[in-house]
Amino acid sequence: MVFVSDSSISLPIWDAPRARGPIVSDLAIPGSKSITNRALILAALASTPSTIIDVLRSRDTDLMTDGLRSLGITITEEAVDRYRVEPGQLSAGSVECGLAGTVMRFLPPVAAFADGPVHFDGDPQARVRPMTSILDALRSLGVEVDNNNLPFTVNAGEVPEGGVVEIDASGSSQFVSGLLLSAPRFKNGVTVKHVGGRLPSMPHIEMTVDMLRSAGIEIEESENQWVVHPGEILGRTWRIEPDLSNATPFLAAAAVTGGTIKINHWPIKTTQPGDAIRSILERMGCEVELVAQGEGYDLSVTGPVALKGIEIDMSDIGELTPTVAALAALASTESRLTGIAHLRGHETDRLAALTAEINKLGGKCTELKDGLLIEPASLHGGVWHSYADHRMATAGAIIGLAVDDVQVEDIKTTSKTFPGFENVWEEMVG
């Protein structure tokens, strides 16, 4: 389902800056949303307090923080990017999910440990996002849930026993991660078995498993199965990596303009799907280099004279699709992006939305059963709709670098994961 703008509502239009030459810039990117929200969940369920450093402040992370506070967790802001989290007895409350998949899918299992009912709701678009898999899984674990989509109420009564749960997570890896994060608190732990089609975004599940192990939890993995043993989640200090997916539009600026972009503090070892942008840009003709800087590394990308298209299975890195699709629309040869049928259930139907917006600007994008075929075409200006989707908005900004008179509707939807994106972007373009 694609959400289009209501003609009765006037959304602000942002004139995407056009690059007049190669862009050269050195940038620091805020912390990872995915890691921040996982750290908040683990800190809330831990046996002792935790400190989270380099927290991302965005709509999604603020919704997670507010949701945990509504359940009785004390979260103290020691600095703008540093939180102290003190766990305690979870209480009845109300959670506003917005459009945050991590909130609507990670917090319902947490709510199973509250001493009363927990009500969930979100933005209108959130009410059609897939939720049945995780809610049915909670029911099979003995948790009462009164609906299959937002709004719904979770009411456990007493600490659930846990056990084996079968789940079809082919629509989103967040269904698996949501169960795994809370699994140690169930009396007998939880065994999660994925029984559906191909599981997307495996790096996000690997991120969840890695963070659980870092908090002292024992997990056994096999193909499409995770056995989480019951135990205390240890309080600790979490340091959040830069959000590599949010870095990709800026690296795309180098690719599009033949410039050089350097992203500070790029992690050498990471479970973030955004790290795949390095190999993608190399295949599209860019020079990509990790440059030693102090105790860490910066990532430097220099764009080519002519950007090449790419054929790639993006099933594990679906969140990069809007960035790669924007690059493909500006490339000199054909691109085929596959393995991303699950994007139809994201903030919007991203495949339909990308197809509509690229073609509206004169592009040649065809929606496939599980992806996109994008052929070279001469683009022109026009309004690029964001569909209240942060990554759709940044895709429009990328195209605007190379095409005159591109206007992005509701650029501030990027505040979901990157508040102030448009200011950083304009400063980069100069």
UniProtKB/Swiss-Prot annotation:
Q: Name one Pfam family in it.
A: EPSP_synthase
State where 3-phosphoshikimate binds. Answer: 33-34, 38, 172-174, 201, 319, 346
Q: Which UniProt keywords apply?
A: Amino-acid biosynthesis, Aromatic amino acid biosynthesis, Cytoplasm, Transferase
Sequence positions that bind phosphoenolpyruvate: 33, 101, 129, 174, 350, 391, 416
Record-listed E.C. numbers: 2.5.1.19
The residues annotated as the active site are 319 (proton acceptor)
Q: Where in the cell is it found?
A: Cytoplasm
Instruction: Tell me the first and last residues of the signal peptide.
Output: none
The entry's cellular-component GO terms read: cytoplasm
Which top-rank group of organisms is this from? Answer: Bacteria
Per UniProt, the enzyme's principal EC class comes to: transferase
Primary location group = cytoplasm
Kindly state which reaction or reactions the protein catalyses. Answer: 3-phosphoshikimate + phosphoenolpyruvate = 5-O-(1-carboxyvinyl)-3-phosphoshikimate + phosphate
CDD domains registered for this protein in UniProt = EPSP_synthase (cd01556)
Per the UniProt entry, what are the Gene Ontology biological process annotations, in alphabetical order?
A: amino acid biosynthetic process; aromatic amino acid family biosynthetic process; chorismate biosynthetic process
- Give the family, as the similarity comment puts it: Belongs to the EPSP synthase family.
- Alphabetized NCBIfam families for the sequence: aroA
Q: How does it assemble?
A: Monomer.
UniProt-recorded name of the protein = 3-phosphoshikimate 1-carboxyvinyltransferase
